[in-house]
Amino acid sequence: MSRLLTVLLVFLLCSGTTLSAADRPNILMILADDVGQEVLGCYGGESYPTLRLDQLAKEGMKFHHGYAMPSCHPTRITLLTGQYPFRLDHPRWGSFPKDQEGETFAQLAKKAGYKTAIAGKWQLALQGTDRKHPERLGFEQSALFGWHEGARYWEPYIWKNGELWKGIEDKYGPDLYTQFLIDFMKTNRDRPFLAYYSMALCHDVTDDLDEPVPYAPGKDRYDSYAEMAAEMDREVGRLLDALDELKLAENTLVIFTGDNGTPMKELTHHENGKYIRKPLFSKIDGEMLQGGKTTLYDTGTRVPLIVRWPAVVKPGQTTDALVDMSDYLPTMAEAMGQPVPSSWQVEGKSFVPVLKGETDTAREWIFAQGRAFEGDPSKKNTAWVRTARWKLYFDGRLFDMENDVREKKPIEPGEGSAEAKHARQKLRQVFETEILRK
C-alpha cells in the first residue's frame, strides 16, 4: 500500500509541475512602431499593402478593442511591467525605473525556463552608456539600435549583445533585427523561447542626431510611410515563414500590436539640415483619416491586435474584448504557466480565457494616459477610462464612441440618456477606486 501511495504521490507532483507542449508555447511578441488600426487592411485600411498581417488575422483572432498609450515610451513601460506609467512616477523619457528591472515579462519567461531575446527599439536607456540594461530586464540576447546614437534604418548603429555591431554600414536595419530573431529561434527550436520584436518600423528616421540621417541608397528622400508599412509587413512575414520552416508555428503564440496611433505627419526629406514633414492621411472604410499619435483620441491610442496560436486559437475569429497595454504581461505569464508573484503590482488581466473561447472579455474597462496625468482634474486630455462604447476623460467629458467616434459631442454631467448617466457613474467610480487608489 505504501508503495502505491508513493507512486500516486509522484504522479500527482509530476502532473502538477509538468506542462504539456500546448501549455508551454513559444512566444513571439511583435510591437510595431507608430501603427494605428487604419494601417492594416484587415481593419478596413485601404492605403497600405499588409497582406501578411491580413493573413495572420485570418489564421487567428483579431481584436477590435486593442489600445495603447498615445506615445511610445509610456506604452513600453506598461507592456514590460503590466503597470501604468503614473503608478511608476512617470519614468523620464528614455529611462526605466530601477526597482522594476526584476519585474518584467522577460524575467517571468526566464523563471519559466524560457530563452529570451529582443531586437529593434529599446528607448529605455542609452545603450552606449548602459550596455547591460536589456540583460538586467531579462533579455539574454539583444540587437537594438542606438537611440540618440545613430541611425535605425540605413547605415544602422546597432548594439548586439552589448557590443557595437561592426560591418553593417551597407545594411538595412530592419533586415538585421529580423534575422537576429530568426537565428535566435533556430538556435532555440528545441526549447521554449520568448522573442520580443520591438520594431523600428513604421517610425520615421529621426534620432535627434547632429546631422540628418541618410536616405536609402539611390534616393533623394526618405521612405514614405506607405513604403515603411510595406516593409513592416514583409519583416513580419519573414518571421512567420521562419516559424513554418522550423515547424514551430503550431505551438507558437504570436502577438502583433502597435505602440500608439499613426503619426499626424510623415517625414519626406531634409533641407539645410532640417527635417521636412507633411500631413499623413490614411483611408479606412472609405474615410480619409489623419493620424493622431500623442493624442488620447482613438487615432492616437487604438491599435491593431492580432493573436495567432494554432494549438489554442481557432482561425478567423474576431472579438470585442477590451485590452490595454497592462494586459500582455499577465497574458504571457498564463500562457507560459508561470504565476505572477503576488508582490508585483500588476494592473492588467490575462486575455488567455478570451483566446480559448472561455469568455467574451477579460475585463470591464481599460485605461490610457497622456504624459501629464497626475490626478489633476483641471487638466484636460490627461487620461481616460472606457468600455467598448463609453469613454470618460478625467476632466469629466463623456463620449458615446459608438455614435461619436471622433468625439465631437461631449455629454456633460447631468445630460444624456439614463444609459449615459449610468456609464458616467460607473467609469467615475473606476477612476476613484482603481486609478486613484494608493
Question: PLM features: residue spans?
Answer:
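Positively charged n-region of N-terminal signal peptides that target proteins for export
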Residues: 1-4
